[in-house]
UniProtKB/Swiss-Prot annotation:
One of its GO terms (molecular function) is excinuclease ABC activity. ATP binds at residues 62-69. It is found in: Cytoplasm. It comes from Mycobacterium tuberculosis (strain ATCC 25618 / H37Rv). Residues 635-654 are annotated as: Disordered. This is UvrABC system protein B. Belongs to the UvrB family. Residues 49-435 form the Helicase ATP-binding domain. InterPro entries: Helicase/UvrB_N, Helicase_ATP-bd, Helicase_C-like, P-loop_NTPase, UVR_dom, UVR_dom_sf, UvrB, UvrB_inter. It holds the Pfam family ResIII. Forms a heterotetramer with UvrA during the search for lesions. Interacts with UvrC in an incision complex.
Length: 719
């Protein structure tokens, strides 16, 4: 039976057109060598009971390492409903996506985060008369994953999307996205030239030389496309104006992967509109422009009026000619046909109305959701006031908390330390999950004096490194983390520094390298907390634990302590000269859970087992097409090469495929890495001159990865 008919708790949206969207059925099925254990069976049963009883909000208080992700997968299997899982940052979203993908291999588990590696928003500083133009660097792989998420949501029901707070930002309406998609069937009459025009209308570009994502090429009666959301290319073979065959094929080798009878090509951008809607939008923009110009001129703001007239007229002309312009999202209100002040369409509107929302690390994620709107609107008001944007640009924004709450149905909050909002929604009730399936208990907490703390820390690090274990060190400031990293390097310790400027996929890669043993110590500030799943870490060192504040609150300390809870010999060392209230609360809660876990183990004869977790991440999915690529002159895949993949039979030695056969770039000095980039650039240009474009593309990918490595070294102050 459909959930909507049994329980009226559904998500509402003025943009959702469910009756127009026919999604393929699909059955969620968990594939796992393990059955629920510890507190998991009781927690899954209780969550299912509460949700089926129609409770709108449910809290799962799950201690670190108790398998909240696995519990979520089993709950999804029980409920059989499309699910949005929200995580507080990209790193945790990547980790969650990978875990759910492993447990739900036959279903669509998608990843939806901001696609910017670098983003400088458009802004105007009135005090200094400084206009800052929007500048950004888009990660092509992450953009593909975003398109993959929206196309899956409009095509099937067995979908889980793992997203960051990016999911509450404006996106094109699902109806426009669907209406502008192109459905193709074998035997159907479709004029070839008409299809090419349709593809151009939805922002695909024709490129017969360089075949990349979001482009198509034409060879006689054959059209080949790489959709914006696919790793594979699509081949359409015509006989006259009739579609004779449809294939999925490898974009580089041309090898046919499978033949299909029908398929749908979704647009290359989420901001699309048909000719009629675009014409209507242009008229509305011109009307608003005239009103705003009259308003500015009546106030004597002639400079602002002229600036707005030039910028907007240019954008209008671009939209008329090519159906798109830079910054088109600022006109989304007109393109969507919305009224002033109304919220934009977001990823939430792509879900069916009976979807389930799971908020991971809710004590962090919930406040994030509520804070996005104010930061965005203050910047936009300045742009509008000084003639850089029309007032309607303010309606290209994230949702407010009230709008978000109105668009969601039933919600499960996951956290080891639930916040006040979640508990208030459930009247203080929660489902508890503190017993780990592996029998692991919470780590022992040791408080040490700050005098001689660095020497003590170095001794502890060396002990752990000798036992092939890892260490996390958390500091209060970026400067302290940088200085500590430099000092540890001077002392001959293999250490890296994780900070907010490291781009999305590189951040995941650093954590993966820590688990692989490429280095022993990871120093961070606020990134070494919620959800980081690192079983090899046996020691977490908290410097300045007695400095009260956001980073040393009881919730923060409990989360940080949890990073050592996945190792049999896990310990937490707090360096402090006094025990604060927050420290006492965190230590007491850890001891309470530890006592309960030990009692359960003794009663059931359980011997704690070390967690053996496969070392994999979202990178495996992002780059897996490289493994299927035919070996050209350089051999192997460039993108995997710079990541130092391990050779079979040599688990301790990181080696590279491709251009760097036998060389470990992660251990290269900075100067050598810079020389290598220069050398590869010359080889890339030579390959391009010789028309060896596939080889040149390999070099390009290598260079991009190495430059990211170089930026990371510069940021960490490595030589």
């Amino acid at each position: 039976m459909a959930f909507a008919t049994e329980h009226p708790v559904v998500a509402h949206s003025e943009y959702r057109a469910v009756e127009e969207i026919v999604r393929a059925g699909g059955h969620f099925e968990v594939v796992s060598p393990h059955a629920p254990a510890g507190d998991q069976p009781a927690a899954i049963d209780e969550l299912e009971r509460r949700i089926n009883a129609g409770e709108r909000d449910v809290v799962l208080l799950g201690a670190t390492g108790t398998g909240k992700s696995a519990t979520t997968a089993w709950l999804i299997e029980r409920l059989q409903r499309p699910t949005l899982v929200m995580a507080p940052n990209k790193t945790l979203a990547a980790q969650l996506a990978n875990e759910l993908r492993e447990m739900l291999p036959h279903n669509a588990v998608e990843y939806f985060v901001s696609y910017y590696d670098y983003y400088q928003p458009e802004a105007y500083i009135a005090q200094t008369d400084t206009y800052i133009e929007k500048d950004s660097s888009i990660n092509d792989d992450v953009e593909r994953l975003r398109h993959s998420a929206t196309s899956a949501l409009l095509s099937r029901r067995d979908v889980v999307v793992v997203a960051s707070v990016s999911c509450i930002y404006g996106l094109g309406t699902p109806q426009s996205y669907l209406d502008r998609s192109v459905e193709l069937k074998v035997g159907e009459e479709v004029p070839r030239d008409g299809l090419l025009r349709l593809l151009v209308d939805v922002q695909y570009t024709r490129n017969d030389m360089s075949f990349t994502r979001g482009s198509f090429r034409v060879r006689g009666d054959t059209v080949e496309i790489i959709p914006s959301y696919e790793e594979l290319a699509v081949r359409i073979e015509f006989f006259g104006d009739e579609i004779e065959a449809l294939y999925y094929l490898h974009p580089l080798t041309g090898e046919v992967i499978r033949q299909v009878d029908s398929l749908r090509i979704f647009p290359a951008t989420h901001y699309v509109a048909g000719p009629e809607r675009m014409a209507h939008a242009v008229s509305a923009i011109e009307e608003e422009l005239a009103e705003r110009l009259a308003e500015l001129e009546s106030q004597g703001k002639l400079l602002e009026a002229q600036r707005l007239r030039m910028r907007t007229n240019y954008d209008i002309e671009m939209m008329r000619q090519v159906g798109f312009c830079s910054g088109i999202e600022n006109y989304s209100r007109h393109i969507d046909g919305r009224g002033p002040g109304t919220p934009p369409a977001t990823l939430l509107d792509y879900f069916p109305e009976d979807f389930l929302l799971v908020i991971d690390e809710s004590h962090v994620t919930v406040p994030q959701i509520g804070g996005m709107y104010e930061g965005d609107i203050s910047r936009k008001r300045n742009l509008v006031e000084y003639g850089f944007r029309l007032p309607s640009a303010c309606d290209n924004r994230p949702l407010t908390w009230e709008e978000f709450a109105d668009r969601i149905g039933q919600t499960v909050y996951l956290s080891a330390t639930p916040g006040p909002y979640e508990l208030s929604q459930t009247g203080g009730e929660f489902v508890e999950q503190v017993i780990r399936p592996t029998g692991l208990v919470d780590p022992k907490v040791v408080v040490k004096p700050t005098k001689g703390q660095i020497d003590d820390l170095i001794g502890e690090i060396r002990t752990r490194a000798d036992a092939d274990q890892r260490v996390l060190v958390t500091t209060l400031t970026k400067k302290m983390a940088e200085d500590l990293t430099d000092y540890l390097l001077e002392m001959g310790i293999r250490v890296r520094y994780l900070h907010s400027e490291v781009d999305t996929l590189r951040r995941v890669e650093l954590l993966r390298q820590l688990r692989l043993g490429d280095y022993d110590v990871l120093v961070g500030i606020n990134l070494l907390r919620e959800g980081l799943d690192l079983p090899e870490v046996s020691l977490v060192a908290i410097l300045d634990a007695d400095k009260e504040g956001f980073l040393r609150s009881s919730r923060s300390l409990i989360q940080t302590i949890g990073r050592a809870a996945r190792n049999v010999s896990g310990e937490v060392h707090m360096y402090a000269d006094k025990i604060t209230d927050s420290m006492r609360e965190a230590i007491d809660e850890t001891e309470r859970r530890r006592a309960k876990q030990i009692a359960y183990n003794e009663a059931n004869g359980i011997d704690p087992q070390p967690l053996r977790k496969k070392i994999a991440d979202i990178l495996d999915q992002v780059y897996r097409e490289a493994d299927d690529t035919a070996v050209v002159e350089v051999g192997g895949s460039g993108r995997n090469a710079s990541r130092g993949r391990r050779a079979q039979g040599e688990p301790g030695r990181a080696v590279s495929a491709g251009v760097f056969e036998g060389r470990d770039t992660s251990a290269m000095p900075r100067a050598e890495l810079a020389d290598l980039i220069k050398d590869l650039t010359a080889q890339m240009m030579a390959a391009a001159r010789d028309l060896q474009f596939e080889l040149a593309a390999r070099f390009r990918d290598e260079i991009a990865d190495l430059k990211r490595e170089l930026r990371g070294m510069d940021a960490a102050g490595l030589k």
